[in-house]
From Swiss-Prot:
Keyword Acetylation attached: no
Organism for this UniProt entry: Anaeromyxobacter sp. (strain K)
Membrane topology type: Peripheral membrane protein
Family: Belongs to the complex I 20 kDa subunit family.
Protein name in the entry: NADH-quinone oxidoreductase subunit B 2
Keyword field: 4Fe-4S, Cell inner membrane, Cell membrane, Iron, Iron-sulfur, Membrane, Metal-binding, NAD, Quinone, Translocase, Transport, Ubiquinone
Amino acid sequence: MASELDGLPVIATRREEAEGFLQGLVSKSLGWARKYSLFTYPFVTACCGMEYMTMASARYDSDRFGAAMPRFSPRQADLLMVVGTVNCKQAPILQRVYEQMADPKWVMAFGVCASSGGFYDNYATVQGIDRVIPVDVYVPGCPPRPEQVLDGIMLLQKKIQNQSHKLIDRKPLPVISGGAGR
């Protein structure tokens, strides 16, 4: 015997399914919001810094992609842009900067030197920052053109939007009842 509801889509039948559906919607909303609000922290060490300044200028307008003005503290940033060569003495500093960033955090290797050590193949140069910290996007070039950097930002935005964004489970605070006759 067919009922009137046959053929209609059912969103959720149990409470757990409804919570999963709601968390999925919230996760997609957070992904959309986070992809357009990247707070960058530039770790500039070499000549690619000139191209970074060009990319951040009004001509290329990185603000329209959500990567606005750079932050002056890694604690305020969620995108670490490693610009240029990193030597072995700077590697612990870079790792400390990465650890100071709050989650979620992403890393962009800006240029060939940050990606693979560039033409500095010697004992003092880190042959790619992925040996020190995890990297999300590699931007090639020596130095990379601003268009390539903006393309890397758009690739990172796609990655951010497709990630699952978990909500923080906050337990309720305990209720402290005070007696009236203390």
